Amino acid sequence: MSEILDLEAKPRTEFGTGAARALRREGRVPAIIYGAGKTPVSISLEEKAITKYYRKPAFISQLINVTIDQKQYKVLPKAVELHPVTDMVRHVDFVFLEAKTQKMEVPIVYEGKERALGVKRGGYFNIVKRRVTLLCDVNNIPRNVTIDVTNMPIATSLKSSKIELPKGCSFVTKKEFVLATIIGRRGAKTEAEAPEVGK
């Protein structure tokens, strides 16, 4: 289980643009928790606290304990609205954690991409997917998926079938897809032309 952050929240009973503006004047932002077949819960959060958490790496896959009137809810961020100028958080959607497995987006970390064999030979590391959708055991939710691409040659593609996922996780889709490629000097090859890593 990855680190769990804590957030204090207050119940929200007034809605609409005017109510949201009033909250923001108090240094708070509106938020909602829904999903897992549960009744949605409308809350407000301290703006500085949630913005600080948002700026942490891999926020979208961060487990959070939200406490409302001494009741605690384990949630995951779903969507975040930011102020267009200040980048402070203006609204957050959370989802309740499911009972056994959780469908979620997880960031991909391509470890060693600057040192990859194909890059050293003049190729360009092209990221096709920055996140993947996984089905994860709720007791083993990863912050990210780390892939070592140091030995990836030039003119190759990295496919989902070659990736070892964290324990308790699987891809939502069974269809194979490309995560990254190393493009040769003369431009990218098609997936059919580009050999898979390890071949």
Curated annotation (Swiss-Prot):
<dbReference type="GO" id="GO:0006412">
    <property type="term" value="P:translation"/>
</dbReference>
<dbReference type="InterPro" id="IPR020055">
    <property type="entry name" value="Ribosomal_bL25_short"/>
</dbReference>
<comment type="subunit">
    <text>Part of the 50S ribosomal subunit; part of the 5S rRNA/L5/L18/L25 subcomplex. Contacts the 5S rRNA. Binds to the 5S rRNA independently of L5 and L18.</text>
</comment>
<keyword id="KW-0699">rRNA-binding</keyword>
<dbReference type="GO" id="GO:0008097">
    <property type="term" value="F:5S rRNA binding"/>
</dbReference>
<keyword id="KW-0687">Ribonucleoprotein</keyword>
<dbReference type="InterPro" id="IPR020056">
    <property type="entry name" value="Rbsml_bL25/Gln-tRNA_synth_N"/>
</dbReference>
<keyword id="KW-0689">Ribosomal protein</keyword>
<dbReference type="GO" id="GO:0003735">
    <property type="term" value="F:structural constituent of ribosome"/>
</dbReference>
<dbReference type="InterPro" id="IPR011035">
    <property type="entry name" value="Ribosomal_bL25/Gln-tRNA_synth"/>
</dbReference>
<dbReference type="GO" id="GO:0022625">
    <property type="term" value="C:cytosolic large ribosomal subunit"/>
</dbReference>
<dbReference type="Pfam" id="PF14693">
    <property type="entry name" value="Ribosomal_TL5_C"/>
</dbReference>
<dbReference type="InterPro" id="IPR037121">
    <property type="entry name" value="Ribosomal_bL25_C"/>
</dbReference>
<dbReference type="InterPro" id="IPR001021">
    <property type="entry name" value="Ribosomal_bL25_long"/>
</dbReference>
<dbReference type="InterPro" id="IPR020057">
    <property type="entry name" value="Ribosomal_bL25_b-dom"/>
</dbReference>
<keyword id="KW-0694">RNA-binding</keyword>
<comment type="similarity">
    <text>Belongs to the bacterial ribosomal protein bL25 family. CTC subfamily.</text>
</comment>
<dbReference type="InterPro" id="IPR029751">
    <property type="entry name" value="Ribosomal_L25_dom"/>
</dbReference>
<dbReference type="Pfam" id="PF01386">
    <property type="entry name" value="Ribosomal_L25p"/>
</dbReference>
<dbReference type="InterPro" id="IPR020930">
    <property type="entry name" value="Ribosomal_uL5_bac-type"/>
</dbReference>
<comment type="function">
    <text>This is one of the proteins that binds to the 5S RNA in the ribosome where it forms part of the central protuberance.</text>
</comment>
<protein>
    <recommendedName>
        <fullName>Large ribosomal subunit protein bL25</fullName>
    </recommendedName>
</protein>
